[in-house]
Amino acid sequence: MVKGRHSKRKGNFHIILRNASLLQRQKLDKSRSTGSLLESRRQPCVLLSFAKLFLLCIVFSPKLDYTKKKTKILKLHQSFGTATILTIFHLHGSRSVAAQNFILFHDYLH
């Protein structure tokens, strides 16, 4: 795993996110070198779980204001892509929270 600087102010969020992104790239590179796209498609549930966990931490964090939440969602979007983020919004159990998340993400995009 990649080691990063730990800052009490920022927490471990950026380190974990970078590690997950690196893991995703390594798996994709491995599947490209073997010529098997199926290999990279077998792992989406792991990445989805990572992204869902991060997104829920962001949305329910009482310490973050709206602007900081948008910034963290930007980082999440850059690491996991639009499809993963939108899938999380649609899979989330609570419709009101899912709608709130989608509005937050939609505001970021526009």
Swiss-Prot record:
Please indicate which superkingdom the organism of origin belongs to.
Answer: Eukaryota
Q: What is this protein called?
A: Uncharacterized protein YLR365W
The species is: Saccharomyces cerevisiae (strain ATCC 204508 / S288c)
